[in-house]
């Protein structure tokens, strides 16, 4: 049995601090709009190029177990920030490093760790209140594009594509990032509800050139169980045929005699019909069928509800403006469901998202929500090589996360101004004893940021600090050029491009880390 190494007091804190500094120093080179790229070696394949702090942090594992504990703590800060806000991981790492360093000094000098921690907590509350106070909602597409552009390394193309996607699908819509097959980065927006199930037989195709089933104003039959017996379908088929409309069948499966008869009737021109398997599995399939029923104004045919297929009437069928189906996917456009019921369903799914503790379930619920409101966009990232593709895709994902955070909780002044307001909030808070020392710890990370940010911008620290401290107005995009006339030309060109930052990422920085009391 392997023995355990045990360290106490100063030696333990020093080892942990080495680990904290090792990881943080590797991560913080990526800070800000002029941050550097990091090249990460892989055991197989090409290396990875990234400017994402959490991606760098996740690759670091130190040989010394005590030092590695410090590195893992800071890694957790970056990971937590990434999970909740999606961006701002490098800034969170720099702040964590500074807070730990100062906390260790106070503990080594005989400070009470618990009182110091209470001071930090009270300072955090004041900072969060101030950040929420100065946050403003993002209303215009231009503001969203600014946030996306900044997070994508000042790439305006990416910022504009993300803003366009957000504008088209809304804040509840799903935006996914995929690798393109060409060198161009493009945006594809899917109208209506789309799910990954295609037609059960190619004989249903109405457009042979595109191999698609296109149905205008069809009736939609939603069946929870498998349909194999044709006699169950005959009554509803006869009713639909009399109306001279098409019938789209969505069921667990359609096979055997039922599928064969539908194909024959389609080929003879008796009725325009198509059948597709219902999306999902188990309880998720039932939920999605109910979503489609509400969207189209229909009723799910389920024996659990006492409704049999042979007793279905036209009132039980849903309708929509158009359905397009190929061999892989189906899109329902402009369902005829009741707006009030749809709104109620959306609220119900929102509540389920808030209650769930599973990331997988949350993702699936968000997909359902996006499908219901008809918002699905795909950003196809193009590049010349695989290495460039991965790097660019990472920037797009970062920018998308920052944009979502900005839309969700608003934006705060960028270019370091929000940190100055952070400092003002701390100065206005008066605590006693060692809690005051804990509160002051939170002002130290600002110095780390103001040393690091100008290094990336190649300007003098004190000049930048003085200019930002004098800037109190929230309308930074118009005020910054006025206050930066004495700075170098490089700052004049960069700072106006940093008008806003997502408030959500700022709120997380002070709460992700506090110094241990070892």
From Swiss-Prot:
Q: Does the keyword Cytoplasm apply?
A: yes
Spell out the subcellular localization from the entry.
Cytoplasm
Main role?
A: Together with its co-chaperonin GroES, plays an essential role in assisting protein folding. The GroEL-GroES system forms a nano-cage that allows encapsulation of the non-native substrate proteins and provides a physical environment optimized to promote and accelerate protein folding.
Recorded protein name is Chaperonin GroEL
Protein family according to the UniProt entry: Belongs to the chaperonin (HSP60) family.
Name the UniProt key words of this record, in alphabetical order.
ATP-binding, Chaperone, Cytoplasm, Isomerase, Nucleotide-binding
Which GO CC annotations does the UniProt entry carry? cytoplasm
E.C. designation(s): 5.6.1.7
Tell me, in one coarse class, where this protein mainly resides: cytoplasm
Q: What is the lineage of its organism?
A: Bacteria, Pseudomonadati, Thermodesulfobacteriota, Desulfobulbia, Desulfobulbales
Q: Which GO terms describe its biological process?
A: protein refolding
């Amino acid at each position: 049995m392997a023995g355990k190494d045990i360290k106490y007091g100063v030696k333990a804190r020093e080892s942990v601090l080495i680990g904290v500094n090792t990881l943080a120093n590797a991560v913080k080179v990526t800070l800000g709009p002029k941050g550097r790229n990091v090249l990460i070696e892989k055991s197989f394949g090409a290396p990875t190029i990234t400017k994402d702090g959490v991606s760098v942090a996740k690759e670091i594992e130190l040989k010394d177990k005590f030092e590695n504990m410090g590195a893992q703590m800071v890694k957790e800060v970056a990971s937590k920030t990434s999970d909740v806000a999606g961006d701002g991981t490098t800034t969170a790492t720099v702040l964590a490093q500074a807070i730990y360093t100062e906390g260790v000094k106070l503990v080594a000098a005989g400070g009470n760790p618990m009182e110091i921690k209470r001071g930090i907590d009270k300072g955090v509350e004041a900072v969060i209140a101030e950040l929420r106070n100065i946050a403003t909602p993002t209303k215009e597409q231009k503001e969203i594009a600014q946030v996306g552009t900044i997070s994508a390394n000042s790439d305006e193309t990416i910022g504009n594509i993300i803003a366009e996607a957000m504008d088209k699908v809304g804040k509840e819509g799903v935006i996914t990032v995929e690798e393109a097959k060409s060198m161009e980065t493009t945006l594809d927006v899917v109208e209506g509800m789309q799910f990954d199930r295609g037609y059960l037989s190619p004989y249903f195709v109405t457009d042979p050139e595109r191999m698609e089933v296109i149905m205008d104003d069809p009736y939609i039959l939603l069946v929870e169980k498998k349909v194999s017996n044709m006699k169950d379908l005959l009554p509803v088929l006869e009713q639909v045929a009399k109306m001279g409309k098409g019938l789209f069948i969505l069921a667990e499966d359609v096979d055997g005699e039922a599928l064969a008869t539908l194909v024959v009737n389609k080929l003879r021109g008796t009725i325009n019909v198509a059948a597709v398997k219902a999306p999902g599995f188990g309880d998720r399939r039932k939920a999605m069928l109910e979503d489609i029923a509400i969207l189209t104004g229909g009723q799910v045919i389920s024996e659990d509800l006492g409704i049999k297929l042979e007793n279905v009437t036209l009132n039980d069928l849903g309708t929509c403006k158009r359905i397009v189906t190929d061999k892989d996917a189906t899109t329902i456009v402009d369902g005829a469901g009741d707006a009030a019921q749809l709104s109620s369903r959306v609220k119900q799914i929102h509540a389920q998202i808030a209650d769930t503790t599973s990331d997988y379930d949350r993702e699936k619920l968000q997909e359902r929500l996006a499908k219901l409101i008809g918002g699905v966009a795909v950003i196809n990232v193009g590049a010349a090589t695989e290495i460039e593709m991965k790097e660019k895709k990472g920037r797009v994902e970062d920018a998308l996360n920052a944009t979502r955070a900005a839309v969700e909780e608003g934006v705060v002044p960028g270019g370091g101004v929000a940190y100055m307001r952070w400092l003002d909030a701390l100065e206005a808070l008066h605590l006693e004893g060692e809690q005051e020392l804990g509160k002051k710890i939170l002002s130290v990370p600002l110095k780390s940021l103001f040393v690091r940010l100008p290094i990336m911008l190649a300007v003098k620290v004190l000049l930048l600090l003085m200019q930002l401290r004098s800037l109190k107005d929230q309308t930074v995009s118009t005020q910054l050029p006025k206050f930066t006339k004495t700075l170098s030309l490089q700052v004049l060109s960069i700072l106006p491009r940093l008008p806003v930052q997502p408030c959500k990422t700022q709120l997380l920085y002070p709460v992700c880390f506090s110094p241990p009391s070892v």
